[in-house]
């Protein structure tokens, strides 16, 4: 399942950027937001969808993965993971 950090790393590869400030500039956000992602916070749903589109990923699956990453409820996480797997195999 994709995570905020996975999305960030893939975006860095795609756009050939390496610094926090460069990534922030590509996304039009503050560099502290990107730094927070590197330190373990999750990105917003809107940005996750925007980055998924840039990367050519399934936006729905990406959004579900970010919601699971953010969730503190194990049952919720398991349900989301199951839905993601079902959609991948459909």
Task: Describe the residue ranges of each PLM region.
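Low-complexity intrinsically disordered segments
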Residues: 1, 30, 86-89
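Recognition helix of helix-turn-helix/homeodomain-like DNA-binding domains
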Residues: 27-43
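Short amphipathic alpha-helical surface patches that mediate protein-protein
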Residues: 28, 39, 56, 67-68
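Short, basic-rich loop-to-helix N-cap that marks the start of a DNA-contacting helix
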Residues: 40-54
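Short, charged recognition helix plus adjacent turn
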Residues: 63-90
């Amino acid at each position: 399942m994709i995570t905020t950090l996975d999305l960030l790393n893939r975006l860095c590869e795609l756009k050939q950027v390496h610094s926090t400030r460069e990534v922030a500039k590509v996304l039009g956000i503050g560099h502290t937001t990107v730094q927070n992602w590197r330190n373990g916070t999750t990105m917003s749903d809107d940005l996750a969808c925007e980055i998924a589109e840039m990367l050519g990923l399934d936006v729905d699956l990406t959004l579900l993965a970010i919601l699971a990453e953010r969730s503190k409820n194990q049952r919720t996480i398991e349900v989301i993971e199951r839905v993601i797997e079902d959609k991948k195999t459909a």
